[in-house]
From Swiss-Prot:
HAMAP family: QueA (MF_00113)
Alphabetically ordered keywords of this record: Cytoplasm, Queuosine biosynthesis, S-adenosyl-L-methionine, Transferase
Locations listed in the record: Cytoplasm
Protein name, per record: S-adenosylmethionine:tRNA ribosyltransferase-isomerase
Species per Swiss-Prot/TrEMBL record: Halothermothrix orenii (strain H 168 / OCM 544 / DSM 9562)
Pathway: tRNA modification; tRNA-queuosine biosynthesis
GO cellular component, one term: cytoplasm
InterPro entries tied to this protein: QueA (IPR003699), QueA_dom1 (IPR042118), QueA_dom2 (IPR042119), QueA_sf (IPR036100)
Known catalytic reactions: 7-aminomethyl-7-carbaguanosine(34) in tRNA + S-adenosyl-L-methionine = epoxyqueuosine(34) in tRNA + adenine + L-methionine + 2 H(+)
Pfam families in the record: Queuosine_synth
Molecular function terms, GO-annotated: S-adenosylmethionine:tRNA ribosyltransferase-isomerase activity
Alphabetized PANTHER family for the sequence: S-ADENOSYLMETHIONINE:TRNA RIBOSYLTRANSFERASE-ISOMERASE
Record-level GO BP terms: queuosine biosynthetic process; tRNA wobble guanine modification
Family to which this protein belongs: Belongs to the QueA family.
Length: 341
């Protein structure tokens, strides 16, 4: 299957540069897989499409201020470092820009020496292994010196950093937000629970695997970068109960989908687990857990668009994207949402 098949043209003005004042005022396109019907509404009306006994599974990861700007020692060259994956205390996989001149042993100073990074090794995806030296607590140092790692297509500074977090973000570790969850408010979550719809959380720390561009010509040749995830026994039991009652398990986002499908050892049999996943879901994949998916509108030729196409069918998804462009939906991280049933 060719990567080109997942390309589409998007007018630049449809890339959402900032979030709406109210999270749940986003538009919502609803795709019904069985009938091919498409409905249009707003996100706060999502309850109308859910039934008592259904279960929403959300990702409670929290974005860390993973973008660091420093100076190479002793030249003073400006260096940007993006934290990707914690290996051990103070040792991280990172992306470095400009990267070509960053060799083993090179040092970078951040915040006038409050944090110093030393290149220890190279990674197989063009990144570096960096050892950090600092006093005190690493998280606190990063909170002070780091910036939120907004995607490159967001060119305006986001005034409220909290808007790039879900309202239920708890576990630090992501370098990008699980964007499907950005549409939920505390009030909407409360209303959903009051309707008898279940809500439960798992964790997948969003890393390079989620947003890394596909450079291969053929979809099958792309390799995902692994991301850490946790699916608890409670999640497994709640999903099992939901399935036994004939109700729907709805994944809030592609990250939840990948975590659940990674934990499915066989059809409809989930296992509690924690670890790393490099699962790559594209058309032809046989879904084992989810019955519905809430997601945003994704970049052309991205692994996220491929996952959505695997779930709803490529033709239906590409038709829905055409309609979204025609009706001027807002795209990408701060954009509108889609519910696939």
């Amino acid at each position: 299957m060719k990567v080109e098949e997942f390309d589409y043209e998007l007018p630049e003005e449809l890339i959402a540069q900032k979030p709406l004042p109210n999270r749940d005022d986003s538009r919502l396109m609803v795709l019904h897989r069985k009938t091919g019907e498409i409905e249009e509404t707003v996100f706060k009306n999502i309850i109308k499409f859910l039934e008592p006994g259904d279960l929403l599974v959300l990702n409670d990861t929290k974005v860390i201020p993973a973008r660091l700007f420093g100076e190479k020692i002793p030249s003073g060259t400006r260096i940007e470092v993006l934290l990707l994956k914690s290996i051990t205390e103070g040792l991280w996989e990172v992306l470095v820009r400009p990267g070509r001149r960053m060799k083993k042993g090179n040092r970078v100073s951040f915040g006038d020496g409050k944090l110093v990074g030393i290149v220890k090794d190279y990674t197989d995806f063009g990144g570096r292994i960096m050892q950090f030296e600092y006093d005190g607590d690493f998280d606190k140092v990063i909170e002070e010196l780091g910036e939120m790692p907004l995607p490159p297509y967001i060119t305006r500074k986001v005034e409220d950093k909290g808007r790039y977090q879900t309202v239920y973000a708890r576990k630090k570790g992501s370098v990008a937000a699980p964007t499907a969850g950005l549409h939920f408010t505390d009030r909407l979550l409360k209303k959903i629970k009051e309707q008898g719809i279940g809500i439960i959380y798992l964790t997948l720390h969003v890393g390079l695997g989620t947003f890394r561009p596909v450079r291969a010509e053929n979809v099958e040749d792309h390799k995902m970068h692994s991301e850490y995830f946790e699916v608890s026994t409670d999640v497994v039991n709640r999903i099992k109960e939901t399935k036994e009652k004939g109700k729907k398990v709805i994944a809030v986002g592609t990250t939840v989908t990948r975590a659940l499908e990674s934990a499915a050892v066989e059809k409809r049999h989930l296992k509690a687990m924690r670890g790393w996943t490099d699962i790559f879901i594209y058309p032809g994949y046989n879904f084992k857990v989810i019955d519905g998916l809430i997601t945003n509108f994704h970049l052309p030729k991205s692994t996220l668009l491929m996952l959505v196409s695997a779930f709803a069918g490529k033709d239906m998804v590409m038709s829905a994207y055409k309609l979204a462009i025609k009706n001027k939906y807002r795209f990408f991280s701060f954009g509108d949402a889609m519910l696939i049933l």
